[in-house]
C-alpha cells in the first residue's frame, strides 16, 4: 500500500505501472486529524481523497480501496465513518479503514467500527477494516 497524499505519495507513473501489471492498489489517506474523524460528517474528507485520487489517474470502479488511517490514540465517530464510506463508494472506490482494534489500547475505534458495521449492514459501504498494532507489521 502507498499513500494518496503527503511526502511519499504514489505518483501517476506508479499508478500507470501498477495498472499495466494488473496489480491491486490500496491507497492510504494519512493526512486526516483526530478533530476531523471525531466529527459527524466525513463527506468533505472523502471528496478531498476522491479528487486527489482522480488527479493522480487512479481508476474508478475497479475495486481500488482508499484507506482512512485512524491513529490508535484517536477517538472517531461512526457517523464520520458512514458519510466518509458513502462518499468514497459513490465515487467509484472501495472505502476502507486502518485502525487498531485492540480494545485494551483504545476501545473507541473498536466500538465505533462496530456501530459503523451495524449501521451499514444492509448497504454496500463496507470495504475493509485493516487492523494493526504498533508491535507488529500490517496483517
Name each model feature, range by range.
Residues 1-84, 89-91:
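Substrate-binding cleft of extracellular glycoside hydrolase catalytic domains
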Residues 45-62, 71-139:
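Surface-exposed substrate-engagement region within the catalytic domains
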Amino acid at each position: 500500500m502507498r499513500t494518496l497524499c503527503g511526502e511519499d505519495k504514489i505518483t501517476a507513473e506508479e499508478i500507470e505501472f501498477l495498472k499495466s501489471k494488473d496489480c491491486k492498489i490500496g491507497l492510504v489517506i494519512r493526512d486526516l486529524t483526530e478533530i476531523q474523524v471525531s466529527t459527524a460528517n466525513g463527506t468533505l474528507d472523502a471528496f478531498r481523497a476522491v479528487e486527489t485520487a482522480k488527479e493522480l489517474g487512479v481508476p474508478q470502479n475497479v475495486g481500488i480501496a482508499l484507506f482512512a488511517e485512524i491513529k490508535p490514540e484517536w477517538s472517531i465517530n461512526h457517523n464520520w465513518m458512514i458519510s466518509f464510506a458513502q462518499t468514497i463508494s459513490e465515487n467509484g472506490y472501495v472505502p476502507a479503514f486502518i485502525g487498531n482494534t485492540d480494545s485494551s489500547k483504545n476501545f473507541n475505534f473498536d466500538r465505533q467500527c462496530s456501530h459503523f458495521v451495524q449501521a451499514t449492514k444492509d448497504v454496500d459501504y463496507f470495504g475493509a477494516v485493516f487492523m494493526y498494532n504498533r508491535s507488529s507489521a500490517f496483517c
